[in-house]
Amino acid sequence: VTALGGDTQHGIRRRNLARVLQTVAAQGPLSRPAVAARIGLTRAGVAPLVDELLRAGLLVGTGRATTGGRGRPGGELAVSDRGPAGIGAEIGVDHLAVCAVDLRGRVRARVAADAANRHSAPGPVLERLSALLAEVTGEIAAEGLRPAGLAVAVPGLVARGATTVVHAPNLGWRAVDLAPGLAGATAPPDGTPALPLTVENEANLGALAELRLGGGDGQPAPPRDFVHVSAEIGIGAAVVVEGQLLRGARGFAGELGHVPVYPDGPACDCGGRGCLEQYAGEEAVLRAGGLAPGRAAAAHPGPGARIGLLARRAAEGDTAVVRALHTAGTALGIALAGAVNLLDPRAVVLGGALAGLAPWILPSLERELALRTSVAADPGRAGGPWVTVSRLGADGPLLGAAHAALQAVLDDPLRSCAPAHSPRN
């Protein structure tokens, strides 16, 4: 929980409100006694906190009786499916997408559009994104939801704690502040304060989605220490240590795509040579597989289309494509081996485009990890990382953005519900 308000009575109350809301959001529906037990407060101490969250519309009574008797209506508590919603947006090289997620974690609205954003001026891109944002906010308003914040996923370096894209090579952007271009989308028409805006690297938001939504469908839940790899045109990574993103001094940690795999390899747009993206990026794999990237993009527009083409060709036994994917897995394994040796994660999670190509990438990737990491010195490999494929796939960054936008409500319910509910201090 974010530290709020110091140790004053007001600050303690705000922290406890957050603890109650977060506990019910993560584990509910729960009875009041169960909430008290989980956060270590007395029932009498929890009661006014619950009442305040009920008045604010952040919690609701389910009407389901608690165990051990008939109970009373609303005896169990759940987070509301109305009220605040997190708005997530994604700016991709070939698409734009927006979604809204409620406190229960359900996607309540989603729109996407093909968009040729590569080397496009930021202004028109943000104008199109603003139109999609207006569409989503209008849709959720009809369901009793209001935006609590906006988070935007971008494929590039983002200044830590700022809204400026420092460099996004695959978009062709440098030093672009998204706040002015999205001002119309973040300023509510009723004159209330502008929505909080977060801009974040897409791989970091993919990792956040993995923390919140990963596992399930027969997969183990992600550990608290893992490396999340996300790829489409470019390749990014996010490092999670003890459940928190490792951002680096400037917020640039995780630029896996520009780790040199073969120092004398082909030139990269970043100015280096032999970068991972030159072997495992989408365009590199298309080229190595005998599919001209430009023609493939024209014939198969839209997010995921070229990845689908590669997967189909590989499944049909196209030798050149299978070989290209094998090379991509080898290069990815070499790059990840350094990260694994340095960080000792419990898992490596493949997301984005890599998830759809995993059957052909994993064998060579895992071989390189076994050869090049300290795991090879452990005969039982008991402590080594496992490599898993995210079930979220290419949806991870967008979902992570929406959940990031909603986090402010969970961290500080008192402030977040202030426009609709102004409790006494």
Residue ranges of each PLM-predicted region?
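ATP-binding/phosphotransfer module of carbohydrate and carboxylate kinases, centering on a glycine-rich
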Residues: V1-G74, A78-A112, R118-R146, A187, ...
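A short, sequence-level motif marking secondary-structure junctions
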Residues: A115-A116, F252
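Phosphate-binding/catalytic loop of phosphoryl-transfer enzymes
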Residues: A89, R146-A153, L157-A284, G400, ...
